[in-house]
Design a protein with these regions (language model features):
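Glycine/proline-enriched, intrinsically flexible loops and inter-domain linkers
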Residues: 1-288
């Protein structure tokens, strides 16, 4: 059955859209900002957690000594491999559920593609507050619309998933719902293991290319929220058609052996992306 419940747009939605980057002062000490972001708990390595268990999955994990945006699982006696990733930024979904969830699917696809694979299908874990709260149900409806939009674009059917409602806390007798968190798990296929692509810079004399248009956009960023303590902004610029075309181009570059590594820009922005790519082989970077 299809539920037809009441839903309404929260008051904050239009308020968040009024954010202006010019209202944020640019810090004088950018080195201090870089150190702050690098140590941020949402950005820093989670190795201390996942190394507590069998993170190598026996001998099947091909990402152990070859870091990739998506986890690569070896298919023995085959030239193919599986690429897997889990993605969601609840802050962006809260700011704009439809765009935020569409972006979560797109980021999952981006991780698969940057690793040398092709997106195949998704599952999900949808975490929301009380569905009888019209504003919470509005978040849920928007998230489903965004997920559907991206899945159609990337041709990734939803093979399964679950919905968890009533995730909330009671503060002074008031129900506070969690941020809407439609977590996306995506499976991809690497048709040829030779196409597996690391996120790490490989050679000190390599050139670094930024693909896609770079915009002066800090909306919903970890930098804006954690460093400036500013929590009211909408989602950053996102165009699903441009995203799809860009991922198609990256896939072509990988298959034609035109690039040595690929890494998507995510939490922490361009600086963190460059830092993550440079650390594994102890290589620095110089950019203009």
């Amino acid at each position: 059955p299809v539920y037809e419940r009441e839903y309404s747009e929260p008051e904050y939605f239009k308020r968040f859209q009024k954010f202006n980057i010019n209202d944020i002062n640019e810090p004088e000490d950018l080195v201090e900002v870089a150190k702050f972001l690098t140590a941020n708990h949402n950005i820093a390595s989670k190795r201390f957690v996942y190394e507590q268990y069998d993170s190598m999955v026996g001998t099947a994990n091909m990402s152990t000594n070859f870091p990739t945006d998506a986890g690569i699982v070896n298919l023995k006696d085959s030239n193919k491999a599986l690429a897997m990733t889990v993605d969601c930024n609840a802050r962006m979904v809260n700011a704009n559920p439809e765009e935020g969830c569409a972006m979560a699917v797109a980021e999952a696809a981006r991780n698969i593609v940057c690793s040398g694979g092709s997106p195949s299908a998704i599952t999900n874990c949808l975490n929301f507050g009380n569905p009888y709260n019209p504003e919470v149900y509005w978040q849920f409806v928007g998230s489903i619309k965004g997920m559907a939009k991206s899945c159609r674009k990337f041709n990734t059917p939803v093979t399964g998933g679950n919905v968890s409602f009533y995730n909330q806390s009671s503060v002074d007798g008031v129900e506070i719902p969690v941020f809407p968190t439609p977590t996306i798990g995506m499976l991809g296929i690497v048709e040829n293991k030779d196409d597996i692509t690391t996120l790490a810079f490989e050679h000190p004399d390599s050139s670094i290319y930024l693909l896609g248009e770079s915009l002066n956009d800090i909306n919903c960023s970890e930098y804006l929220v954690s460093y400036h303590k500013f929590n009211e902004s909408t989602t950053p610029f996102f165009d699903l058609d441009i995203e799809f075309d860009l991922q198609t181009s990256v896939s072509s570059l990988i298959k034609n052996k035109l690039i040595l590594s690929a890494h998507d820009i995510s939490d922490g922005g361009l600086f963190i992306t460059l830092l993550e790519s440079s650390m594994y082989n102890n290589l620095g970077f110089s950019i203009k």
